[in-house]
């Protein structure tokens, strides 16, 4: 029997949390290891749903709708956003960070995601790796992101975001 740990249990055990993230990021837990070389229909639907979340985020961002962009994140105090040397915890705090950092349309620019790789690590969890870029009048910041998604009541949501700038 497989026992799934809650996020709180994982968070309280740093070794387990680090181990799970390491597994997810290195791809040790993959469909090939499980003996599946092609995603089944449920897996394909999950990947499509995750892509739809990311597409909706890009659309919201490019409309200047930060709250719409944040709909892709789990509305929980356990949501984590890591960037640079800063870790922000909680959906509301992440929203406030975005609003402070991108308080004008000029600062928001036009967002694109590319080189997306989405891997299911269980029926209710997935990892997405990709590139982001903002096209603005004065510059073009860009970088990489790794997102951990969880299937929640409203659908797939980002529970952990690690974004870096190039």
Where are the regions a protein language model picked out?
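A short, structured loop/turn motif at beta-sheet edges
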Residues: 118-126, 150-155
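A solvent-exposed, acidic/Ser-Thr-rich amphipathic alpha-helical stretch
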Residues: 48, 66-121, 133, 140
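Bacterial N-terminal signal peptides
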Residues: 17-28
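Bacterial N-terminal signal peptides that target proteins for export
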Residues: 2-19
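Short, low-complexity N-terminal intrinsically disordered segments enriched in polar/charged residues
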Residues: 33-72, 76, 93
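Short, surface-exposed beta-strand-loop junctions and turns on beta-sheet-rich folds
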Residues: 134-135, 165
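Short beta-strand edge/turn micro-motifs at domain boundaries
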Residues: 142-166
């Amino acid at each position: 029997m497989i026992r799934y740990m809650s996020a709180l249990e994982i968070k309280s055990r740093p070794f387990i949390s680090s181990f799970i993230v390491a597994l997810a990021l290195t791809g040790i837990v993959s469909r090939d290891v499980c003996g599946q070389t092609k995603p089944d229909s449920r897996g394909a639907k999950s990947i499509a749903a995750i892509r739809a979340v990311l597409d909706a985020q890009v659309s919201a961002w490019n409309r200047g709708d930060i709250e719409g962009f944040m709909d892709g994140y789990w509305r929980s105090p356990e949501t984590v956003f890591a960037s640079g040397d800063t870790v922000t915890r909680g959906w509301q705090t992440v929203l406030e960070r975005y609003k402070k950092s991108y308080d004008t349309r000029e600062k928001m620019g036009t967002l694109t995601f590319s080189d997306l790789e989405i891997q299911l690590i269980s029926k209710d969890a997935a990892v997405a790796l990709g590139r982001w870029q903002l096209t603005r009048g004065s510059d073009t910041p860009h970088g990489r992101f790794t997102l951990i998604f969880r299937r929640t009541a409203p659908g797939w949501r980002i529970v952990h975001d690690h974004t870096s700038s190039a």
